[in-house]
Amino acid sequence: MSRKSVIQRNLKRISICDRLKSKREKLRAIIKDQSISMNDRFLAQVKLSKLPRDSSYIRIRNRCLITGRPRGCYRKFKVSRIVLRQLGSIGQIPGLTKSSW
């Protein structure tokens, strides 16, 4: 299991990203728009660089909600492969069945 501080750090990044997502998207649209003057685009780039690093979605790590495991995490279920197998075998995940062929 991951340390609690690592899990909390990731949750903090998710909340910051959600809060500043629209502002970041507007600035990126200004930077990419070729019809706007170079000076305005540069000012938008400066404003974007002054935003917190943690507001970027790239810094968010997909983690298991139960164990905090960073690898082998299924996005659809938001749990790791180990927890998915445990929950699936006891029938806690609806619609998930053990395959046999």
UniProtKB/Swiss-Prot annotation:
GO terms for molecular function: rRNA binding; structural constituent of ribosome. It comes from the Bacteria. The keyword Ribosomal protein applies. Pfam families: Ribosomal_S14. GO terms for cellular component: cytoplasm; small ribosomal subunit. InterPro entries: Ribosomal_uS14, Ribosomal_uS14_bac/plastid, Ribosomal_uS14_CS. Keywords: Ribonucleoprotein, Ribosomal protein, RNA-binding, rRNA-binding. One of its GO terms (biological process) is translation. The keyword RNA-binding applies. NCBIfam families: PRK08881.1 (NF006477). Belongs to the universal ribosomal protein uS14 family. Part of the 30S ribosomal subunit. Contacts proteins S3 and S10. Binds 16S rRNA, required for the assembly of 30S particles and may also be responsible for determining the conformation of the 16S rRNA at the A site. This is Small ribosomal subunit protein uS14. It comes from Ehrlichia ruminantium (strain Welgevonden). The lineage of its organism: Bacteria, Pseudomonadati, Pseudomonadota, Alphaproteobacteria, Rickettsiales.
